[in-house]
Curated annotation (Swiss-Prot):
Keywords attached to this entry: Ribonucleoprotein, Ribosomal protein, RNA-binding, rRNA-binding
GO biological process, one term: translation
Organism: Nitrosomonas europaea (strain ATCC 19718 / CIP 103999 / KCTC 2705 / NBRC 14298)
A GO-annotated cellular component: cytoplasm
Upper lineage: Bacteria, Pseudomonadati, Pseudomonadota, Betaproteobacteria, Nitrosomonadales
Name of the protein this chain belongs to: Small ribosomal subunit protein uS14
Gene designation per UniProt: rpsN
Length: 101
């Protein structure tokens, strides 16, 4: 199990990312627009730098929903590899079967 403080920190970052997502997308679109002038891009860059660091989606970490494990997480299920295997072996995930060839 991951420490609760680490898991809660990631959840707090997720809320911050969602809060600033629209504003961030608007600013980034100005920066990526080839037709915008240099002054507009400079002011957009300043606005982007004034946003909180945790508003960047890069700072998020995928974690297992059950254990909080940061590595080996299958994003389709939101579970770590260990818990995914345990749940799949019990047959609790419809359509998921063990591979055999």
């Amino acid at each position: 199990m991951a420490k609760k403080s680490i898991v809660n920190r990631n959840l707090k970052r997720l809320k911050t990312v969602n809060k600033y997502a629209a504003r961030r997308a608007e600013i980034v679109s100005i920066l990526r627009d080839a037709g915008s002038d240099i002054e507009a891009k400079a002011s957009a860059r300043d606005l982007l730098q004034k946003l909180p660091r945790n508003a960047s989606p890069v700072r998020l970490r995928q974690r297992c929903a059950l254990t909080g494990r940061p590595r080996g997480v299958f994003s389709k299920f939101g579970l770590g590899r260990i818990k995914l295997r345990e749940i799949a072996m019990r047959g609790e995930i419809p359509g998921l079967i063990k591979a055999s060839w």
